Amino acid sequence: MVSTTLATITIMSTLVGYTTGPLTDYMWLLIVGFIIAFVLAFSVGANDVANSFGTAVGSGVVTLRQACILASIFETLGSVLLGAKVSETIRKGIIDVTMYKDIEHVLMAGSVSAMFGSAVWQLAASFLKLPISGTHCIVGATIGFSLVAKGQQGVKWLELLRIVASWFLSPLLSGVMSAVLFYFVRMFILQKKDPVPNGLRALPFFYAVTMGINLFSIMFTGAPMLGFDKLPWWGVLLISIGFGIITALIVWFAVCPRLKKKIECEVKSSSPSESPLMEKRELHEAHSPILKPVPEESSVLSSSTPTTPPLPPPEERRVTFDIGDSDDADQKDCKESDLGGAPKTAHVHFTNGPAHIPSNGYSQYHTVHKDSGLYKDLLHKLHLAKVGDCMGEGGDRPIRRNNSYTSYTMAIIGMHGDFKPKESEFRASEDGDKEKAGAQERKRIRMDSYTSYCNAVAENGTPEDLGEGEVTLEMVDEDAGSSRSSLEEDRTDADKPEVSMLFQFLQILTACFGSFAHGGNDVSNAIGPLVALWLVYESGSVISSAPTPIWLLLYGGVGICVGLWVWGRRVIQTMGRDLTPITPSSGFSIELASAVTVVVASNIGLPVSTTHCKVGSVVAVGWLRSRKAVDWRLFRNIFMAWFVTVPISGLISAAIMALFNYVIL
């Protein structure tokens, strides 16, 4: 990052070396501005790019590395081809720059202050894994420095009111549209016994709408580089509709037949079931024994004398999950417990009665499958606990909720033995009494998630078949009766593999389009003030009709990509996993509906934010899929971050501008 910035500054210095003018003495402001602009672009990449690929990563359609590669390509292309138009709006649309005539150096200092304030708050939000609007950041920072430099004169307060309105309009409109779209997808495709025929029939329509909406969004920006600024709105509309129809025909005659054959081949190669493709993993695992003897255990059993009386079976065994506050607070909570403190925890108790104690000498450790109803039921209870993730009665071993889908262990039914956390590993013992000398330690044998789920169900029956004295799940301060209804409600949430094959490329396509449009729109958040700084320095006047230099847009695009690779995973994790589980079908509904909302609302004059639209869609679809799967506490934190974005970025910018105005300049 430092080398790229220094190289750009060197080139810039060479270009302006022959320029002489009244602002030559303020070249240091230009250099500082380039450095801060790159940091700002870095923060935009770390935070805002999650809007495009967060749901795609969360649904498993692409890996994080693949998302970073695709986003780097399309963000850079979008910033170069589309960024010039939007940079003009950021440069001239918030304040009246004519007020700074004859005091151009004050506007230069203000641009540096605005970039600094926006960068600091976006980096802080990225650290906290909170998606915020980069546009609102730079607008708040611009207003902040203007209030210090010129007071309320020249500030366009109507723009600020539009921003406040967008906090509520954006998530509401996009959420409603996403929920409606997903409702029809679920009704006519997902809930059918065989979803493939209806899915194939709907595929051309989905592709046509996706291509048409995204093409219209890109062309309507009027990018000068591509000549779109010369097209009338009706011309853009006709081109978009025509391109969508052509796409639908290609998909119907070329893509659908090939996809149908591919699905049929997958179905034929697997045993018949409700979800045939899922059985392939079972068939592969059936060739290898899952439970193997443990050498240490065998030696202990062989050395034991037959005269040793067997220990009486315990009447009840209980494992308690102490659930802490958040991933970042795990270590803090555990330290507090070590120091004798009492961190705030809630307890999830799993009680296993003696009816199912294994007699074959094995203790089984089951990993919960990410798409099982039991996993989602536990996920719901952890969310409602509103506290974090420490496991074990003493907080010995923290569970990371967001590390992977296998972090909620020991929640599966069929849990055997008494579990005691150790420093190096967890072992299962025959009895929970630590003082009894004859207790034998048994190693837990890890199973793959889907196989362990099937084995547990085969051994113990479905959760409905188990009595209260055998396996129960209860939670302090929560109605235990909600477990059964939540489990039944969430069983049909996961997409069948056939459905995933239908929607996965659609979701990748919408994510790429979104990344391209995002590069054109949000590069202005990083480069808009820098463009103003550069043009003022080069021309010596605040009134400049010069076009935005392409190399400045490329500079911002590179900074965005660096931020994405270094720190982008944090907010991607929030958008794709933490708020609610995402599937390919729900991810596609989120992407398409939020894109439609942005295009329609922007063109009828309603203030919307891409970030707010995407978060609203994620929450609405997650709530529709499962009433209890949305982390409402996290959504509350995100909304509070939206609320303080403009004031905080404005205050930071105002403080830096005051330093410039009263101390440095």
UniProtKB/Swiss-Prot annotation:
Q: Which domain of life is it from?
A: Eukaryota
Gene Ontology cellular-component terms for this entry are: membrane
Asked whether the UniProt record includes Membrane among its keywords, one would answer yes
Q: Which UniProt keywords apply?
A: Membrane, Phosphate transport, Symport, Transmembrane, Transmembrane helix, Transport
Q: Name one Pfam family in it.
A: PHO4
- Biased composition of type Low complexity is found at 296-306
**Basic and acidic residues compositional bias, start-end:** 329-338
Region (Disordered) spans which residues?
Answer: 294-345, 423-442
Primary localisation category: membrane
MF terms per GO, please?
A: phosphate transmembrane transporter activity; symporter activity
Q: Which InterPro entries match?
A: Phos_transporter
- Tell me its family: Belongs to the inorganic phosphate transporter (PiT) (TC 2.A.20) family.
Function of this protein? Sodium-phosphate symporter which plays a fundamental housekeeping role in phosphate transport.
This protein is called Sodium-dependent phosphate transporter 1-B
Source organism per entry reads: Danio rerio (Zebrafish)
Q: What is the lineage of its organism?
A: Eukaryota, Metazoa, Chordata, Craniata, Vertebrata
The coding gene here is slc20a1b
